[in-house]
């Protein structure tokens, strides 16, 4: 390993520092006086500098949730590729693909659950907030809940489509089925899949088929967990919707007041113009009267 000897340079710096230290001592510089001039012991002499209010500690949770959601998006992209490979007809063993699908599914579900847990902890921390901070916390949590809900709903839809393909169901939803609650439909299919695995185990069917159905059941369990989390987050999203409705109402009222103020301003402007004309007319009348008086005085003389 190559290196350079810097001992000489270090000695030069040390000697230079000693030289400057002696010069400062000769000039009468006292470090204690310098410290006293910078830091006052008397609180009366201290100048209070007003600092900006720091952001609440719970705001930092947004970065953690963003990181988790970014990780879920990456894993979902990988999972989509595995789904596409697995549904292709093939006579080869797909155990490795099924294990990878199961691993990614569990990891994505756990990331969404971590997001929900962070949201619950943050909500507990903001319960003591009052005034404007409470309003800000409510809007902040509602926004995060909406983002988590959107991401989890998209993932649940992908899982449901894949599960229907595995179960031999039609993944394309008909117009009649689209009117039904998708969450209830997905949960019903998932529960049916789990019950079918239990029935196959009781009947002692082929181990290979049972193992395949267990992998499918894991996906079904993930759908049920995400559906439950979706319902929990819906409460915060509804609160955000109510808040948005109130904001829209306030905006509409502001527009009404602005139009009313514009009308009043137009009236005031017209009154001001009329006042100027009236003053000019009065001035002309006074001028005419003055001229008549002057003319009358001249005639009398």
Curated annotation (Swiss-Prot):
Gene name of the record: tlg2
Name of the protein in question: t-SNARE affecting a late Golgi compartment protein 2
Family classification: Belongs to the syntaxin family.
Residues that span the membrane, as ranges: 280-300
PANTHER family from the UniProt entry: SYNTAXIN, SYNTAXIN-16
SUPFAM superfamilies: t-snare proteins (SSF47661)
Alphabetic keyword roster: Coiled coil, Endosome, Golgi apparatus, Membrane, Protein transport, Transmembrane, Transmembrane helix, Transport
CDD domains xref list: SNARE_syntaxin16
GO BP: intracellular protein transport; vesicle docking; vesicle fusion
Topological type in the membrane: Single-pass type IV membrane protein
Domain t-SNARE coiled-coil homology span(s) in chain numbering: 206-268
Parts forming coiled coils: 92-120
Function: t-SNARE that functions in transport from the endosome to the late Golgi and on the endocytic pathway.
Organism: Schizosaccharomyces pombe (strain 972 / ATCC 24843)
SMART domains: t_SNARE
Gene Ontology CC: cytosol; endomembrane system; endosome membrane; Golgi apparatus; SNARE complex
Residue spans, topological domain Cytoplasmic: 1-279
Parts of the chain on the Vesicular side: 301
């Amino acid at each position: 390993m190559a290196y350079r000897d810097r001992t000489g340079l270090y000695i030069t710096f040390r000697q230079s520092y000693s030289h400057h230290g002696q010069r400062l001592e000769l000039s009468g510089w006292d470090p204690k006086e310098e410290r006293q001039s910078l830091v006052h012991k008397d609180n009366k002499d201290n100048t209070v500098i007003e600092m900006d209010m720091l952001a609440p500690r719970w705001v930092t949770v947004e970065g953690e949730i963003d990181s988790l959601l970014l990780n879920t998006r990456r894993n979902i992209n990988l999972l989509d590729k595995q789904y596409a490979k697995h549904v292709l007809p093939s006579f080869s063993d797909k155990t490795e693909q099924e294990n990878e699908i199961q691993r990614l599914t569990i990891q994505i579900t756990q990331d969404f659950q971590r997001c929900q847990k962070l949201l619950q902890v943050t909500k507990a921390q903001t319960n003591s907030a009052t005034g404007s901070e409470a309003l800000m916390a409510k809007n902040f949590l509602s926004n995060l809940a909406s983002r988590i809900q959107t991401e989890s709903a998209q993932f649940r839809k992908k899982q449901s489509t894949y599960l229907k393909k595995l179960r031999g169901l039609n993944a394309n939803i008909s117009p009649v089925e689209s009117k039904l609650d998708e969450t209830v439909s997905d949960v019903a299919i998932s529960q049916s899949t789990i019950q079918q695995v239990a029935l196959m185990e009781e009947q002692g069917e082929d181990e290979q088929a049972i193992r395949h159905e267990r992998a499918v059941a894991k996906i079904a369990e993930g759908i049920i967990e995400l559906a439950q989390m979706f319902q929990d987050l819906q409460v915060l999203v509804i609160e955000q919707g109510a808040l948005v409705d109130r904001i829209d109402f306030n905006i509409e009222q502001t527009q009404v007041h602005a139009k009313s103020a514009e009308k009043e301003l137009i009236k005031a402007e017209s009154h001001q113009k009329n006042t100027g004309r009236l003053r000019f007319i009065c001035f002309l009348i006074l001028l005419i009267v003055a001229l008549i008086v002057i003319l009358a005085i001249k005639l009398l003389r």
